């Protein structure tokens, strides 16, 4: 499976903890991420991660393009719902493209754990 990993700044440490917990599962899949999320994962795990631009610089749109062309099967997008994001339209577009292409997307840990435990 091809999995995209994205996290807002206030969720990056939590995502890293989640990824470390399931590193043995994620290691068998192809991973991509926005730049700073991917760098954090690469520096703190043994996982290989293809990195796109940071979200505000177009990374969300790059991953959206990968979804639209059939190159992503799952998205883990841990959003910070309590902090306004300057690139909110890009985030909305990414979630929309997931819906258009019927791509499962986890925006919180409960959903992410269900996906990992039941599908991956």
Swiss-Prot record:
Domain MGS-like: 1-120
Biological processes, Gene Ontology terms: methylglyoxal biosynthetic process
Record-linked Pfam families: MGS
Entry EC number(s): 4.2.3.3
Keyword terms, alphabetized: Lyase
SMART domains: MGS
GO molecular function: methylglyoxal synthase activity
Leading EC class: lyase
Gene Ontology CC, one term: cytosol
Catalytic machinery residues: 60
Catalysed reactions, as listed in the record: dihydroxyacetone phosphate = methylglyoxal + phosphate
Protein's job: Catalyzes the formation of methylglyoxal from dihydroxyacetone phosphate.
Annotated family: Belongs to the methylglyoxal synthase family.
Protein name in the entry: Methylglyoxal synthase
Organism of origin: Natranaerobius thermophilus (strain ATCC BAA-1301 / DSM 18059 / JW/NM-WN-LF)
Gene of this entry: mgsA
């Amino acid at each position: 499976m091809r999995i995209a990993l994205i996290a807002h700044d206030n969720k990056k440490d939590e995502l890293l903890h989640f990824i470390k917990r399931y590193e043995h599962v994620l290691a068998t899949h192809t991973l991509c991420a926005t730049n700073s999320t991917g760098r954090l994962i690469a520096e703190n795990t043994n996982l290989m991660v293809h990195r796109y631009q940071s979200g505000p610089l177009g990374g969300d749109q790059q991953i959206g393009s990968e979804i639209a062309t059939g190159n992503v099967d799952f998205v883990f997008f841990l959003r910070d719902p309590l902090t306004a994001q300057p690139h909110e339209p890009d985030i909305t577009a990414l979630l929309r493209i997931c819906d258009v292409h019927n791509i499962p997307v986890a925006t919180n840990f409960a959903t992410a754990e269900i996906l990992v435990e039941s599908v991956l």
